[in-house]
C-alpha cells in the first residue's frame, strides 16, 4: 500500500464523529461548488462534479445540500466566491507535503496554513517547491478479501488502470485522472466493492523517515486536514507497517 493509501486509511478511521462529519460536509460542499462552477452543473457531463457528488453521497450528505452546492456553482443560488489554492511544503524528516484548499479568503488561509506547518516542525515552501515530486492520479482501494485477484486485474487493466498493486489489506489501483470515472464504473458493474476512490496527488517516489519523524508527519497532516479550508493532503512519506498497526490499534 502506498503512502497515499496508508494516509487515507488513517484519516478514514478518525472521521467517524458527528463533528468531523459536519466539517467534511462543509468541505465537500465547497468542492462541489467549485466543480460545478468550472465544468457545469450536470454530473453526467462533468467528471469532476460526478466524483465530488459521489464522495458527498458516500459521506451521507443530504441530497438537498448537494443540490444547493451545485446551484451555487452554476450561479442559480447566490453564494461565496471561492478559489482553489495549492500549498506546498516540507514536514519533519524532510518529507514533501501538499495541501489543496478551497477558500473565500486567501489572505486569511495562507498565514493559517503557514502556522500549521511551523507548529508541527515543518515549513511552508514556495510554489513548485515540491509539486514536481507528485502526479495527479486516480486511486482506488479494493479490499483483498472481497475480490479475486485475476478478476480485478483483468477488469482494471481493460479499463485504463496503469498499475494494480497488492498489499494487506487492500489492492491499490492507479489510473490517469481522465480514466477514473470509466474504471470506477467498470469495477462497480462487476460488483467489486470499492473501499475508497479519489483523484489526488500521488508521489512519484516515497521516503521513509524514522518512526518518531513519521509520527510527527502524521500529526502535521492531521492538523492540515483539520483546517476548515483544506480539502486534501498528500505526502511522499511511506508509513511503516509497524506504525500502521500501532495507529490501527492492532
Describe the function of each predicted region.
Residues 139-250:
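Positively charged, low-complexity, intrinsically disordered RNA-binding extensions
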Amino acid at each position: 500500500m502506498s503512502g497515499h493509501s496508508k494516509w487515507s486509511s488513517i484519516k478514514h478511521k478518525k472521521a467517524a464523529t458527528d463533528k468531523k462529519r459536519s466539517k467534511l460536509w462543509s468541505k465537500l460542499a465547497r468542492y462541489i461548488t467549485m466543480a460545478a462552477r468550472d465544468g457545469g452543473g450536470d454530473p453526467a457531463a462533468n467528471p469532476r462534479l460526478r466524483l465530488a457528488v459521489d464522495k458527498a453521497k458516500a459521506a451521507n450528505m443530504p441530497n438537498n445540500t448537494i443540490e444547493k452546492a451545485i446551484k451555487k456553482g452554476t450561479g442559480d443560488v447566490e453564494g461565496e466566491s471561492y478559489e482553489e489554492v495549492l500549498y506546498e511544503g516540507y514536514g519533519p524528516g524532510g518529507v514533501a507535503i501538499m495541501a489543496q484548499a478551497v477558500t473565500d479568503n486567501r489572505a486569511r488561509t495562507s498565514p493559517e496554513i503557514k502556522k500549521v506547518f511551523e507548529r508541527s516542525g515543518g515549513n511552508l515552501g514556495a510554489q513548485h517547491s515540491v509539486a514536481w515530486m507528485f502526479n495527479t492520479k486516480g486511486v482506488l482501494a479494493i479490499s483483498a478479501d472481497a475480490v479475486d485477484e485475476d478478476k480485478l486485474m483483468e477488469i482494471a487493466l481493460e479499463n485504463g488502470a496503469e498499475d494494480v498493486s497488492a498489499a494487506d489489506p487492500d489492492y491499490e489501483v492507479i489510473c490517469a485522472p481522465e480514466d477514473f470515472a470509466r474504471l470506477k464504473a467498470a469495477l462497480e458493474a462487476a460488483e467489486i466493492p470499492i473501499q475508497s476512490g479519489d483523484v489526488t496527488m500521488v508521489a512519484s517516489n516515497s521516503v521513509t523517515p524514522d518512526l518518531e519523524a513519521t509520527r510527527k508527519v502524521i500529526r502535521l497532516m492531521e492538523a492540515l486536514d483539520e483546517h476548515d479550508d483544506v480539502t486534501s493532503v498528500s505526502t511522499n512519506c511511506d508509513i511503516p507497517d509497524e506504525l500502521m498497526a500501532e495507529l490501527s490499534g492492532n
